[in-house]
């Protein structure tokens, strides 16, 4: 018996495409992050994060009054290299897509 595949909402399709741009294909769960200091690039394993959050960066000079997606590793927050987004809903969709891709069985 086969079941019909549920239709994917357009917002999720868009968010999956956004998140997929920053996947690092070395192993499941790796995504590009904004480097700190003099690093040229950075990547983190979202599977190891304690939380994935959306953050309203009012005080951030780089993205004033925008929403970003961050991975928390204990007390350290790492901004993922997606966005920034104009509204919270977009950031939540992308955070959901990042988790979906990170824990997907389809990755190498």
What do the PLM-derived regions correspond to, one by one?
Residues 2, 39, 80-81:
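Short, flexible active-site loop motifs that bind/organize anionic cofactors or intermediates
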Residues 7-68:
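Short N-terminal "domain-start" leader segments
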Residues 8, 12, 76, 95-97:
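Terminal low-complexity, poorly structured segments
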Residues 77-88:
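A short, exposed loop/beta-hairpin motif centered on an aromatic-Gly-Thr core
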Residues 86-105:
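A short, charged, amphipathic alpha-helix used as a generic interaction element across diverse proteins
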């Amino acid at each position: 018996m086969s079941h019909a595949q549920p239709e994917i909402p357009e917002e999720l399709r868009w968010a999956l495409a956004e998140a997929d741009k920053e996947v690092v294909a070395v192993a499941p769960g790796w995504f590009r992050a904004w480097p700190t200091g003099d690093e040229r690039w950075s990547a983190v394993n979202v599977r190891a994060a304690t939380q994935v959050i959306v953050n309203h960066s009012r005080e951030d000079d780089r993205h004033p009054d925008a929403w970003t997606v961050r991975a928390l590793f204990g007390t350290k927050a790492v901004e993922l290299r997606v966005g920034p987004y104009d509204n919270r809903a977009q950031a939540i969709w992308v955070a959901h897509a990042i988790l979906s891709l990170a824990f997907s069985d389809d990755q190498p």
